[in-house]
Amino acid sequence: MSSREEVVNFAAGPAAMITSVVEEFGKDFVNFQGLGMGVAEISHRSKQGSGIVTSAESNFRKLYNIPENFHILFMQGGGTEQFAACLYNVYAHHALKNGNAKSLVANYIITGAWSKKAYAEAERLGFPCHVAVDMKELAGKYGSLPEDKDLKFTPDGETSLVYYCDNETVHGVEFNEPPTNIPKGAIRVCDVSSNFISRKIDFTKHDIIFAGAQKNAGPAGITVVFVRDSVLARPTPAELHKLNIPVSPTVSDYKIMADNHSLYNTLPVATLHAINLGLEYMLEHGGLVALEASSIEKSKLLYDTLDKHDLYISVVEPAARSRMNVTFRIEPQELESEFLAEAEKHHLVQLKGYRSVGGIRASLYNAISVEQTRRLIDLLESFAKAHSN
């Protein structure tokens, strides 16, 4: 049996959590605020339950300096549910001013597996959609970012939304800046699930931002959505039916969730409490400035180690490398299973790459310290030495 102190969990999600946060949550799971009930047993509509929601909203605003013209929603269904939710809400919003909203086209910037899945969902649901760029088609594989000239958007006034994934968890690709030259009138949608709470967000360049909590914020079960207030405006469902615009399911409707303080249906307040404990910890330990500095330090140490050994092949162009999900191969690839087995012996776990791409992936989320990253680096060094020609 291994102790928590021995094991370094490099999982891509659900991922490692800060130990002191887990310990505090464990106490509250048994007895929350002296109620004689655990936090998972209290009503989401109770004073304590709604207090968790209010506190988490406040802490997110402090951490990100979120403008007052953005709502914070706590939803369910993961990032995958947001693939559909953003479409329903955006088309309903456009219908308020454009009777021909159903002809507007959703544009997707595809840089890896998750943005591709988002596009596939739009196709499956029958929304008009267009690929502004697919980096696999452009470059032969996922591992780079598009230049402005690569982005082939539909024209101004004909575009419903522009969607991109800020950090591709599977392929280890991360944007350095939001895409530019977005068509006029388009709603800007961004999936930040796997680099959430790791750097500042420019809210002037986004309208909908969402993140599944299970990577950098806490346990699975809640999706955090930041949505510009203006996007919440939409016709009634009856009016949308007349315009032949799809009506969002109730639990995916941003306006309903905003009007009900994220408590329209049963919110997993225990999960949100765990997230909020993490927010409090991060605010007390330097906030986003400290978190970004740590992520840069950890990823630089790891990439520098990979780059100096021919045994390791980084599969992402340097300018597109993720700070969160470091992906690489070992040549010859037969050595990868040996490396993973050796890592397990050293209590370095969950390093196997995503099932569709293979290889090695080390996820350096906030709960992974510089010291823990150095433990992986030490193994990489010794493994390279043992297999040098």
UniProtKB/Swiss-Prot annotation:
Cofactor note (record): Binds 1 pyridoxal phosphate per subunit.
Keywords: Amino-acid biosynthesis, Aminotransferase, Pyridoxal phosphate, Serine biosynthesis, Transferase
InterPro entries the UniProt entry points to: Aminotrans_V_dom, Aminotrans_V_PyrdxlP_BS, Pser_aminoTfrase, PyrdxlP-dep_Trfase, PyrdxlP-dep_Trfase_major, PyrdxlP-dep_Trfase_small
Leader sequence residues: none
Cofactor section: pyridoxal 5'-phosphate
Metabolic or biological pathway, per its Swiss-Prot or TrEMBL entry: Amino-acid biosynthesis; L-serine biosynthesis; L-serine from 3-phospho-D-glycerate: step 2/3; Cofactor biosynthesis; pyridoxine 5'-phosphate biosynthesis; pyridoxine 5'-phosphate from D-erythrose 4-phosphate: step 3/5
Keyword Transferase (UniProt): yes
EC number: 2.6.1.52
Enzyme class: transferase
GO biological process: L-serine biosynthetic process
Xref: PANTHER family: PHOSPHOSERINE AMINOTRANSFERASE
HAMAP family for this protein: SerC_aminotrans_5
Function comment: Catalyzes the reversible conversion of 3-phosphohydroxypyruvate to phosphoserine and of 3-hydroxy-2-oxo-4-phosphonooxybutanoate to phosphohydroxythreonine.
Name the record gives this protein: Putative phosphoserine aminotransferase
Lineage, broadest ranks: Eukaryota, Fungi, Dikarya, Ascomycota, Taphrinomycotina
